[in-house]
């Protein structure tokens, strides 16, 4: 991750957009019989995405990792060097009876990252930081592409959406020190500048989607 440190009182404003609900979504009746489902997203540094989706009601687990590459293995050193074409990704295990795939997509596009940036997110540059959706089922691919088309037609963003929609191939969990990074390192400079503002914006915009506080 690139370290963009706050200078003086300057802080990076987190990306956020108010966008419409997906018109097309997966019927929960068709998925609940299978139990939990998985969604795999890539949108810049995976630390903040993981922390954000862990707070969504109906999400059971989130892991950071790597998807979408050309090699049958992945680790941070190889991925960050651009040698495998994997993207920093998160794997979300969720209960479709509590949160739909379309709802996860809306959060991903509106607060999770800026989907108009090509092969980067802010200070983080390279294919490993691209915007991508790795559909684990044909239904997910259909819903994701339909939502992108809907957002484009409604001109929800000032620029074209750069998000790639690909069939899921594999997910390689990231190293242990990358798991729950924001929770374990709240004072890390990158977290302070980029991830905590994103979390605050998410909590404000989606207060009705948060897990109950224990």
Swiss-Prot record:
GO terms for molecular function: L-methionine:thioredoxin-disulfide S-oxidoreductase activity; peptide-methionine (S)-S-oxide reductase activity. Keywords: Oxidoreductase. It catalyses: L-methionyl-[protein] + [thioredoxin]-disulfide + H2O = L-methionyl-(S)-S-oxide-[protein] + [thioredoxin]-dithiol; [thioredoxin]-disulfide + L-methionine + H2O = L-methionine (S)-S-oxide + [thioredoxin]-dithiol. InterPro entries: Met_Sox_Rdtase_MsrA_dom, Met_Sox_Rdtase_MsrA_sf. It comes from the Bacteria. Its EC number is 1.8.4.11. GO terms for biological process: protein modification process. It is an enzyme of class 1 (oxidoreductase). The active site is at 45. It holds the Pfam family PMSR. Belongs to the MsrA Met sulfoxide reductase family. Has an important function as a repair enzyme for proteins that have been inactivated by oxidation. Catalyzes the reversible oxidation-reduction of methionine sulfoxide in proteins to methionine. PANTHER family: PEPTIDE METHIONINE SULFOXIDE REDUCTASE, PEPTIDE METHIONINE SULFOXIDE REDUCTASE MSRA 2. This is Peptide methionine sulfoxide reductase MsrA 2.
